[in-house]
Amino acid sequence: MKIKVVDMPYEQALAQPREKHTPPRRPSMLFRALLRALSAPDLRATHFRCDRVGMERLGPDEPCLVLMNHSCFLDLKITAAVLYPRPFNIVCTSDGFVGKAGLMRALGCIPTRKFQPDTALVRDMLYAVKKLKSSILLYPEASYSFDGTATPLPESLGKCVKALGVPIVLLRTCGAFARDPLYNGLQNRRVNVSAELRYLLSPEEAAEKSADEINALLADEFSFDNFRWQQENGVVVNEPFRADGLNRVLYKCPHCGTEGETEGRGTELICRDCGVRYRLTELGALECENAEAKFTHVPDWYAWERACVREELEQGSYLLDAPVSICVMVNFRQICRVGEGRLRHDANGFRLTGCGGKLDFTQKPETSYSLYADYFWYELGDMICIGDRDVLYYCFPQGNGDVVAKTRLAAEELYKLKRAERAAKNG
């Protein structure tokens, strides 16, 4: 999938009119049927099946909140099939509306800015379930998994569940990540995909629980490990490109400690600095071919990288300072490519400068619990996004080495550290 991009001077981009808020629309039966029909070929190719658990508790015309894990673009096609003919609105990233806002609204999409405060979102969701009598599809992780494990959930989720006052349904997929992991550059593998659609909480059950209790329940439901699932279920991925781009996730060599010198190509991940070589097996495990393996499991390696980043933050040595190509979004007409600059990230948060000295934007560490970061974003490149309600800045690192995953890890760990500091200060 691509996105409309226009070259434009920075001042001209910022001078564009802002997008006016528009209430959600209930998707028509025609669009629901069309989306289902368009989804059918890919689902047939994956021999898709869905198990339904407790769904007899949900009335045929009763709106609900569907919470789904987010693995790849196939997720939406799965939802179109398993929820049909039930009408549902989809909470999606605002840049998905660029160049096609009318179509997205007709499909029932509700735009939101990832990892940015959005007070209008809950109002739109309430409008959908109360006025439109439509269900809501929400990906609470708000981003694709890098390493095949769950990403953090927002603390506001429990409050949102209670505010909506509708049944909560969980849609969990298996095989979608193994078929199309984000790091692998949109190369689909031959993997069967399945899902479970499960009635989780009635409105009455949700009302009896505190927001914190609901958060704990959902955190448990969204704990998963796709690589472990692949190994335990003997799911074979024998494509010769299965390790392509794995360096985007495993960017730091555990043997020599060098960052940005790993390279995933074919079935192997190598370190160009020390020469260590790993093979990603057909079952998704790691085998070291010329040394004693430090890790045999991709998520364990990624967790080690997270621990290393946290240690850097605690010691005050963490720093990202990278040249970037910069795009901005101020409305749904287009993404504006505005020039070059530098993105700095340290204990004080983000600072983006550039466009001949005209751009100087900062974002504090406490702004969000995570970071909008993506690989091969709309086929433009690996991307880090910061911003506010007015403007979103899409930064594409231009230097050597993979910095996107580390930056997201750092943003998440820095948020935790700042929250802990504030809690300690307040007693």
Question: Residue locations for each model-derived region?
Answer:
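Cys/His-rich short segments
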Residues: 238-292
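A broadly conserved sequence feature marking short terminus-proximal activation segments
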Residues: 191-259, 389-402, 407
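Helix-enriched interaction subdomains in cytosolic or periplasmic regions
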Residues: 16-39
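Soluble catalytic domains of membrane acyltransferases
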Residues: 27-31, 43-216, 232-233, 240, ...
